[in-house]
Amino acid sequence: MESVKKLPDSEMKLMELIWDSEPVRSGDLVSLSLEKHGWKKSTVYTILKKLVNKGFVINDDSVITSTRPREEVLSDRSEEEIERSYGGSLPMFLTAFLSREKLTKKEAEELKKLIDDYTEEG
């Protein structure tokens, strides 16, 4: 399976529709894509073929299902972006992110809990 970073925005947009609707018939996916993104049938099938070839979806008798959960793909994509833009430094990423706006008290508590949950012991 290909790396998530090889998924252009158009492929990620189609993946979002698939995750939200799966299993979804290809004709229904075309309708959803037209409604949500203004894409023609040929555009949807071109993108869909790329996703099948990359191993992100299965097209079984015109029924489309994903092969990877949304959370996994988004996590991989985030990790690759942090690696590319911040040299893999999570503190640098958080500094850049937090410099734009303050966290609410609830958001800060949630982040502290996540850090505690994922901190290595020893």
Features from the language model and the residues they span:
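Short, cationic-aromatic polyanion-contact patches
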Residues: 3-10, 62-82
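Short helix-coil-helix linker/hinge
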Residues: 7-10, 23, 87
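Pre-recognition alpha-helix immediately N-terminal to the DNA-recognition helix
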Residues: 12-17
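Short helix-to-turn junction characteristic of helix-turn-helix DNA-binding domains
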Residues: 18-22
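Short acidic, hydrophobic short linear motifs in intrinsically disordered regions
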Residues: 24-33
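Short, hydrophobic-biased segments on the C-terminal half of alpha helices
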Residues: 45-49
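A short, conserved structural fragment
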Residues: 52-62
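Amphipathic alpha-helical dimerization/coiled-coil segments
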Residues: 79-121
